[in-house]
Every structure is written in C-alpha cells, then in structure tokens.
C-alpha cells in the first residue's frame, strides 16, 4: 500500500486560514496556529454580533422615537399606546426615520396618538 503524504492538503488548509486572517495584527496574520485561533474567535464574534445587531438597531429606533415624542409632549410608551389605539400600524424603524427626517409628519402622528388616548 502506498504511503499517503498530506503536504498538499495541509498547505491548502493553512493557506485558507491565513487568507481569512489577512489584515490581522502581528502573528495573528502570519503564524498558522495563532491565526487559526483568531479566525475561530472572529467567527464566534460575528455569529454573536449578527444577533446583537438586531437588538441594537431596535434600541436605537426606540431612543430616537422617544426623543422626538418627548419634544412633542408625549412619552414613548404613551405614544406607542396611542398609535395602537388609533390603529396606526407603522413599525419602529419607519417611525424613527420619520422622526429624524420629517418632523412635521411625526408631529401629525403624535397628534393622532394624543387624540386616540383622550
């Protein structure tokens, strides 16, 4: 039986990892063993942060809506409650966009929410 030499496969595997680690600082981009750990850790961070990104954006939208609603004399929770009672179904992403870029339209939404609460 012929002897199996793994040089080609090992080289390819190492090249693949070192290519992924390109741009990392110091040994993390040059030494296979260190680069492998760095790439694994980067993958874990990426996986975790793809989920956190969704939470962080929602927090940002809520903070923006809250600030704009308070300028118009209503808290965030009362504003959202008023919109629900007025059966206005606009998601937080769009509300935050309106709050930042179209203050007049947001003011109108606040007035409708106030009317529904009264």
From Swiss-Prot:
Belongs to the bacterial ribosomal protein bL20 family. Pfam families: Ribosomal_L20. Keywords: Ribonucleoprotein, Ribosomal protein, RNA-binding, rRNA-binding. This is Large ribosomal subunit protein bL20. PANTHER family: 39S RIBOSOMAL PROTEIN L20. One of its GO terms (cellular component) is ribonucleoprotein complex. One of its GO terms (biological process) is translation. It comes from the Bacteria.
């Amino acid at each position: 039986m012929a002897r199996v030499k793994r040089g080609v496969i090992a080289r390819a595997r190492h090249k693949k990892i070192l290519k992924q680690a390109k741009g990392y600082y110091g040994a993390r981009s040059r030494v296979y063993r260190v680069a492998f750990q760095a790439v694994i850790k980067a993958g874990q961070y990426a996986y975790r942060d793809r989920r956190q990104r969704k939470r962080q954006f929602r927090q940002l939208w809520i903070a923006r809506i809250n600030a704009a609603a308070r300028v118009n004399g209503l808290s965030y929770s009362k504003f959202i409650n008023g919109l629900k009672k007025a059966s206005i179904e606009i998601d937080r992403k769009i509300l935050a966009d309106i709050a930042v870029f179209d203050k007049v339209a947001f003011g109108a939404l606040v007035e409708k929410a106030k009317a529904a609460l009264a």
